């Protein structure tokens, strides 16, 4: 039996009118919305943010900085977890044992070495009061004292029963104090000469001629900078201020910030210790095993092994060390210039935080020397290059400036490894012919190729020099 289906009633004219009216209103609303949604975008020829030879204002890369620290935290946590599963302790490793040994002895030695800087204050008071002249006996006496300080630092570092990590920290800090001592004494010695020369001219009873008046103006300009004058600057607080300041060049005036930001000090301290911890993890996991295997291979090498055999072993070791050493180099760079220097600058309210420029874009080695470590660059320029250039040509002054820098680098490596091999001296001096080649027109026209060559030399060079000092 089939049930009958009731017939549908036809809509009335009133319902049809209301229905079409609603559809019409909806169509009008959609039209207005679509006009706003599909109107043309305001497009213009704009390169990518990461495109070369283009700078976009107000581009914020803070997210990459946050990503880096998140990755660091994850890596540290994973290291803790792995160590705890294997040994039951979160922190293990050879490098951690090095850090824990002889810490008190290192602290005492470093404090004594740093305190020697304060002896420069009474030493310069002698010249300010006129008991001795700087350009005379003063320069010779200072040269003897600075050599004694350097000898003390080297002997204290090499003869102590310290690990290589302690030797590295001590000798690097010694080099910083050495440069600060030199700048403080040389600049204040020059001020003492200007001060006594000015007093001599002003005490003349006769009228000054034009040259003497020009000399008076010159000396007054040198001895007064933004209201800070010599010899009023020769005080213990001023010497301590320069000791803790992230500058290697002494002067009467430095720009200052309004106040010290405690939260920023905490941020710098946490970042520094986090990077140091990450450096330890990289060393223990990716450097020590490779170097231990290489040392074992060299010791167990057959007696008739040729130079080719050792060259292959060296190349194999360098290949496995390139990435961890490159990463360590970047972390050390951050620790020094973003962590330690900014912490020191914040404490002393030192306002000029331009400790480096965009050295990662360098396409010549002289660019790198000027931009990656600006405090040392300013020191070498002011206290080495300019004095040499007063009686030498520009090329000879540049050569000897590189030579002084290379000798200091070799001294640092010798104190850390307890070996004098000359690898650092040789490779740093080879930068001079590289610079000559990089200044040719072809390289200047193809800066990308220069930057690629720069990064290859950095990546290979750091691992190669480290492997040479450790293995041979």
Curated annotation (Swiss-Prot):
Record keywords: Acyltransferase, Endoplasmic reticulum, Glycoprotein, Membrane, Phosphoprotein, Transferase, Transmembrane, Transmembrane helix
Major location (coarse): endoplasmic reticulum
Matching Pfam families: MBOAT
TM stretches of this protein: 61-81, 111-131, 135-155, 170-190, 262-282, 317-337, 452-472
Membrane topology category: Multi-pass membrane protein
Glycosylated position list: 161, 233, 342
GO BP annotations, alphabetical order: ergosterol metabolic process; lipid droplet formation
Molecular-function GO terms, alphabetical: ergosterol O-acyltransferase activity
Cellular location(s): Endoplasmic reticulum membrane
Modified residues (Phosphoserine): 12
Sequence motif FYXDWWN motif, residues: 355-361
One of the record's GO cellular component terms: cortical endoplasmic reticulum
Catalytic EC class: transferase
Domain of life: Eukaryota
The protein's Enzyme Commission number: 2.3.1.-
Disulfide-linked positions: none
Active site: 409
Function, as annotated: Sterol O-acyltransferase that catalyzes the formation of stery esters.
Family listed: Belongs to the membrane-bound acyltransferase family. Sterol o-acyltransferase subfamily.
UniProt-recorded name of the protein: Probable sterol O-acyltransferase 2
Protein source organism: Schizosaccharomyces pombe (strain 972 / ATCC 24843) (Fission yeast)
Gene name linked to the record: are2
């Amino acid at each position: 039996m089939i049930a009958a289906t009731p017939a549908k009633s036809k809509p009335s004219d009133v319902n049809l009118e209301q229905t079409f009216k609603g559809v019409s209103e909806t169509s009008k609303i959609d039209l207005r919305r679509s006009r706003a949604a599909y109107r043309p975008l305001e497009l213009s020829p704009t390169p990518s943010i990461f495109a070369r030879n283009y700078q976009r204002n107000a581009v914020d890369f803070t997210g990459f900085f946050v990503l880096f620290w998140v990755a660091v935290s994850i890596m540290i946590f994973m290291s803790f977890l792995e160590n705890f599963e294997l040994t039951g302790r979160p922190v293990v490793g050879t490098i951690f044992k090095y850090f824990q040994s002889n810490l008190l002895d290192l602290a005492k030695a470093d404090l004594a070495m740093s305190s020697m800087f304060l002896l420069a204050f009474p030493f310069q008071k002698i010249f300010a009061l006129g008991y001795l002249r700087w350009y005379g006996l003063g320069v010779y006496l200072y040269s003897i004292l600075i050599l004694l300080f350097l000898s003390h630092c080297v002997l204290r570092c090499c003869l102590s029963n310290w690990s290589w990590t302690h030797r590295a920290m001590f000798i690097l800090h010694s080099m910083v104090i050495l440069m600060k001592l030199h700048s403080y004494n040389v600049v204040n010695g020059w001020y003492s000469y200007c001060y006594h020369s000015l007093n001599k001219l002003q005490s003349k009873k006769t009228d000054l001629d034009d040259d003497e008046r020009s000399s008076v103006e010159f000396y007054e300009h040198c001895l007064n900078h933004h209201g800070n004058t010599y010899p009023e600057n020769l005080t213990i607080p001023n010497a301590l201020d320069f000791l803790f300041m992230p500058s290697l060049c002494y002067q009467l005036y430095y720009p200052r910030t309004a106040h010290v930001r405690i939260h920023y000090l905490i941020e710098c301290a946490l970042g520094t210790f986090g990077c140091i911890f990450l450096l330890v993890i990289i060393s223990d996991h990716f450097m020590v095993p490779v170097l231990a295997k290489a040392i074992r291979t060299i010791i167990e090498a057959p007696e008739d092994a040729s130079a080719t055999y050792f060259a292959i072993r060296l190349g194999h070791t360098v290949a496995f060390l390139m990435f961890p050493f490159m990463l360590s180099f970047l972390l050390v760079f951050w620790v020094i210039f973003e962590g330690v220097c900014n912490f020191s600058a914040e404490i002393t309210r030192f306002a000029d935080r331009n400790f480096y420029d965009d050295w990662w874009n360098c396409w010549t080695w002289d660019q790198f020397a000027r931009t990656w470590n600006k405090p040392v660059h300013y020191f070498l320029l002011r206290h080495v290059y300019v004095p040499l250039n007063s009686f030498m040509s520009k090329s000879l002054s540049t050569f000897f400036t590189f030579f002084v820098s290379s000798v200091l680098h070799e001294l640092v490596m010798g104190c850390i490894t307890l070996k004098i091999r000359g690898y650092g001296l040789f490779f740093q001096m080879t930068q001079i012919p590289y610079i000559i080649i990089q200044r040719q027109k072809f390289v200047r026209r193809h800066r990308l190729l220069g930057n690629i060559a720069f990064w290859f030399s950095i990546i290979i060079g750091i691992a190669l020099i480290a492997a040479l000092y450790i293995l041979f």
